[in-house]
Amino acid sequence: MELRKDKLLMFYSEGKESKEAKWAVNDPMSKSYKLSLPSALRPDNLLPGNRLRYTDASKSKSSKVSWYKTILDPGSEIVLKWNWVFIVSCMVALFIDPLYFFVPAIGGDKNYPCARTDTSLSILVTFFRTIADLFYLLHIFIKFRTGFIAPNSSTRVFGRGELVMDPKAIAWRYIKSDFIIDLIATLPLPQIVIWFVISTTKSYRFDHNNNAIALIVLLQYIPRFYLIIPLSSQIVKATGVVTKTAWAGAAYNLLLYMLASHVLGAAWYILSVDRYTSCWKSRCNGEAGQVNCQLYYLDCDSMYDNNQMTWANVTKVFKLCDARNGEFKYGIFGNAITKNVVSSQFFERYFYCLWWGLQQLSSYGQNLSTTMFMGETTFAVLIAIFGLVLFAHLIGNMQTYLQSLTVRLEEWRLKKRDTEEWMRHRQLPEELRNRVRRYEQYKWLATRGVDEEVLLQSLPTDLRRDIQRHLCLDLVRRVPFFSQMDDQLLDAICERLVSSLCTEGTYLVREGDLISEMLFIIRGRLESSTTNGGRTGFFNSIILRPGDFCGEELLSWALLPKSTLNLPSSTRTVRALVEVEAFALRAEDLKFVANQFRRLHSKKLQHTFRFYSHHWRTWAACFIQAAWRRYKRRVMENNLTAIESMENEEGEVGEELVVVEEEECVEESPRTKMNLGVMVLASRFAANTRRGVAAQRVKDVELPRFKKPEEPDFSAEHDD
Amino acid sequence: MNKIRSLRCLLPETITSASTAASNRGSDGSQFSVLWRHQILDPDSNIVTYWNHVFLITSILALFLDPFYFYVPYVGGPACLSIDISLAATVTFFRTVADIFHLLHIFMKFRTAFVARSSRVFGRGELVMDSREIAMRYLKTDFLIDVAAMLPLPQLVIWLVIPAATNGTANHANSTLALIVLVQYIPRSFIIFPLNQRIIKTTGFIAKTAWAGAAYNLLLYILASHVLGAMWYLSSIGRQFSCWSNVCKKDNALRVLDCLPSFLDCKSLEQPERQYWQNVTQVLSHCDATSSTTNFKFGMFAEAFTTQVATTDFVSKYLYCLWWGLRNLSSYGQNITTSVYLGETLFCITICIFGLILFTLLIGNMQSSLQSMSVRVEEWRVKRRDTEEWMRHRQLPPELQERVRRFVQYKWLATRGVDEESILHSLPTDLRREIQRHLCLSLVRRVPFFSQMDDQLLDAICGCLVSSLSTAGTYIFREGDPVNEMLFVIRGQIESSTTNGGRSGFFNSTTLRPGDFCGEELLTWALMPNSTLNLPSSTRSVRALSEVEAFALSAEDLKFVAHQFKRLQSKKLQHAFRYYSHQWRAWGACFVQSAWRRYKRRKLAKELSLHESSGYYYPDETGYNEEDEETREYYYGSDEEGGSMDNTNLGATILASKFAANTRRGTNQKASSSSTGKKDGSSTSLKMPQLFKPDEPDFSIDKEDV
């Protein structure tokens, strides 16, 4: 291990010369390490060694060696893609192999059938199988170049574990574990047997070789099928699932079912041909007459000489082996012979056998009527067992995928039914029930049954903040109150904003209730009204639109230096006119932000708050109305004073009024210190409220006093 | 659209205090909404959801209707095909009605808004209401499939087939019609999947009840059987016709007979050339599916002719084909005996695959639906089994086990397994308050202590009240335990008793009925100016006599309400609290009894002093001293009480007189018991144990300000 660590350290220290270092790391480092030379001499040895070898080796060799010696990470993207490609090629190879069973066929005519070989089919299947074998070979090569996790308990206790990158250790581990199975699966056995068969022409060898092909393909099928199981588990271990969507999983299971039908049909076909030809052979060997029967007479490639033609005229082999009238019992293989499946074209043969396999597999072989032949009975037992296993597997997997598709919908349906049952149990009035149903419907449309809070809580802090910034920041900047803040303050506020959904007709807050959150409207409209504490004759109503906020009493409360627990009471009643989507900032979150970020205490925010606060606008409107009425009263009294100049008592009353006006002017004097920005905002405000003021009717009755709203304490010194 | 919206955000809102301006704007909005409602529809509104359901039903009916075109050809005579014109006309009529629904669907898609993708970041998203954008988006996505499904192709072929039948190409026309219906079946089936998705997206489910979902899946299964049976029938007719065609070509090749293609059409039955050909030819014997000597292999299609399906009337034919499809679909085609013909084999493979898929889907969906029906009952059953197993594991005594079972049964009756808190918590604040007001307010007003509060205070208290269930025999509080909640009795009876701190010889017991409350020490604690964390200790033991349903107000909620609402601190509430508090009543009863005993003792001493001479002067002086001490001790309390009583108004006097009337019976009983005790030992009665005056909650506002 120490030697490996030293090599790794040398490898990483010389990053730029990685190729040369890899080339040189074997010979001089190991030698120098064994000789235990002092460290000062190592660079002197390395430099001339590198130069000498660099001059000797060509560029192509160095690039090939570097590619050849690359060690792959088993969790990396390229290995995962290769696993996918390899599992697909394994499935295709499993599909190609049973096509070898269709190579033997029955030729000739009805009177004189003979056994033949479909040479074009064998060549085609061999070609495709060779391509599939190349994938297996490439798989072995990649396994020799893929690292593995060290099995020591100390490395896997925490995290993912350490990778072993030594080629020798990788090769040794692979040879000890999976190499034998991979080698058996890779061997091109059917190709060798096929090319050996083509060279021979004798019939008895032909029959023997047919059985040899079937046996070899079946034997090699087992390791090839076995390869898929650890490959699937590797994919599951790396990514969590084999298929990304549920429908792909269902299609994958159906494909396995079709593959089993394909193998079963092909096996049935070759067993039928074998039964047919074995009948011929037994009758041919047992036939004793004028002309002896040779086995090559049954081959379609025979010479057709005089002896064979004489034998064909007198023989009774084909009559005895007739599937309809003969003595031989074919059992479940009789259909293949009576319906001329074994003597049809390839596509007819293939699709009929696929249909036969599918039929028997899905009905667990209950249509089969067998003879006492042991091979046939064993085959039927295998069909029944595989049918049961595959059918149950198919239904179970389909059901699992269906449930995963509809689990969210079922949860929603259950919740809706629970709510309906609970409302009926508690005998809520119909109006309340309709409101609850409308809110549930709206919540489904907005969230589709997914709990956003739970999803966000399971992510790390940085991701959560980035996601909430993506969700909130563009919308929050639309609110003018937030546009004055900097990014850090906005990030802190975005983390604490909660989306709030209100259906039509909902009272968000009533006058006199406690305010527990501040709402910033994103979509929809709200009606905000006040009676100034229930005073008769006073009513003010405005429409809040996207970009406005309500619950601004909470900001005054949050900026108070004394942290009292009492929440402020609302001075307005807020009701949703249409469906409203808003961001809510809760009381404790607002107090936390106000305490943490001193930048919230600034005059700029104070002026923006005054400008956009409807509370302040209402007060300003009342103030202007009171000033106007005072002006009109003063003008009228001046006229009256001018008309009636002789009464002294009225003059005294006028003096008192003048004194009151002077006091109010004194109160207004601190406002003259505001800067130019405030004056611009004030003039804009005055221009916008001109229409509202003009619409007011002149009332001689004294207007009830509207209290000035409590101003939030934006000063930073007071907190200190 | 975005520019207009941004401009609106920049402009500050004007204060609309004028009523005329508000009325004008309201009327203008209503007119605009009427115009808007007629033009562009909201995809989540009720009218679009209703239309989606209607269109889904009509689409399924159209899928059911199209395979009837396959039954139009039939065997009308020996070796000839004919066309059922009445059936074709009927199916064409109904299909035209279905096509009108498809046309209306296309029109609705041009008038339905969609949610802009960029606005889906928050909430439900914003709707795009521009007609041009809606049309452009629809043309780019689903328009081609909708048009392909809407085209009246079979109608055109039918009207072309009828005049072309005179040419003798009946089979060719039939094949064309079948091919067109099959090709159009694909987009028509494809329409249902996004329609299902849209309905689920809007409402959350396809069917409201589980049984409707199961019936829907079964209906799809029967629809597949119907299509499969129709295809089998048409393929059988095709195989029969191909056999006739082969024999006809063979006759022409042998030059024995002249066989025209029109001979295979039933319209040529009366022609003499056709009759001569029919008598001489061997087509009937060669193409007879019922005969075993025929050379042509009908395979699975022979059944259509052995059972006379192809020549019988429509209703019998249709029902047999439906049965054939249902049988082979549900058994994955295992009863089919096929020939080696390639088309037949492919058809059987398709039957088997569709059978597997539909059977698996049916079982899976049925199980999901059935599971959702009984999920609450199963949860409750599992919970009860867990409870029983846990009680057995912990070896609880049988009496405790019985109490647990009784409580679990009672809780099921009260809630039916539904978690009320989670349902309420998922609703917004206003709805939650309305529901809790509906649930609590009429019951809370029955408690006299709450009737003194105003609506706003009651709303806040209703928001904090939690329902509490106790079975008979349960001790809610024990004397000396900390009080963590205040109970207001709604149903049932509670026994409240005290031994005044475990003092021997003292016992007071009352029965609390609906409208009473217990745990009133908590109110004293909540109104203290200094917020201490220690909960008060209970001075009484409270036990449930029957099953009790009450509202509980927890300690932190009570402190929150007391701090938030200054109106809780008022003299009116103080008097109501004293009047209805059983603790104060007990103290009042003890005070009255002590006063009475003091009066009787003073009277007896006075009488004795009159009759006795100067020889007994020393013992009289001792008794007088004791009496004086007791009088001084109670006089102190009496002074304080008297001082506060002087300040009360007329309402307090009325309450006091009502209080005196209610406690008259209790006083009489206590007097009789005290007289009995006096007879036993006068020394014990002389040393009467003193009940401490209960702590009074601080209702004054001035101290709070300090």
Curated annotation (Swiss-Prot), chain A:
Its main location: membrane. Residues 597-612 are annotated as: Calmodulin-binding. It is a multi-pass membrane protein. GO terms for molecular function: calmodulin binding; cAMP binding; cGMP binding; voltage-gated potassium channel activity. Residues 1-85, 143-178, 233-252, 399-720 are cytoplasmic. One of its GO terms (cellular component) is plasma membrane. Keywords: Calmodulin-binding, cAMP, cAMP-binding, Cell membrane, cGMP, cGMP-binding, Ion channel, Ion transport, Ligand-gated ion channel, Membrane, Nucleotide-binding, Transmembrane, Transmembrane helix, Transport. The binding of calmodulin to the C-terminus might interfere with cyclic nucleotide binding and thus channel activation. This is Cyclic nucleotide-gated ion channel 17. The lineage of its organism: Eukaryota, Viridiplantae, Streptophyta, Embryophyta, Tracheophyta. The gene is CNGC17.
Swiss-Prot record, chain B:
Residues 661-706 are annotated as: Disordered. GO terms for biological process: intracellular calcium ion homeostasis; pollen tube growth. It is found in: Cell membrane; Cytoplasmic vesicle membrane. Residues 75-86, 164-174, 239-345 are extracellular. GO terms for cellular component: apical plasma membrane; cytoplasmic vesicle membrane. Residues 585-614 form the IQ domain. It is a multi-pass membrane protein. A nucleoside 3',5'-cyclic phosphate binds at residues 449-579. InterPro entries: cNMP-bd_dom (IPR000595), cNMP-bd_dom_sf (IPR018490), Ion_trans_dom (IPR005821), RmlC-like_jellyroll (IPR014710). Expressed in pollen grains. Not detected in leaves, roots or root hairs. Residues 565-580 are annotated as: Calmodulin-binding. GO terms for molecular function: calcium channel activity; calmodulin binding; cAMP binding; cGMP binding. Homomultimer. Interacts with CPK32. Belongs to the cyclic nucleotide-gated cation channel (TC 1.A.1.5) family. Cyclic nucleotide-gated ion channel required for directional pollen tube growth into the transmitting tract. Acts as a Ca(2+)-permeable divalent cation-selective channel inhibited by either lanthanum or gadolinium. Regulated by CPK32 to mediate Ca(2+) transport across the plasma membrane in response to Ca(2+) oscillation. This is Cyclic nucleotide-gated ion channel 18. It comes from Arabidopsis thaliana (Mouse-ear cress).
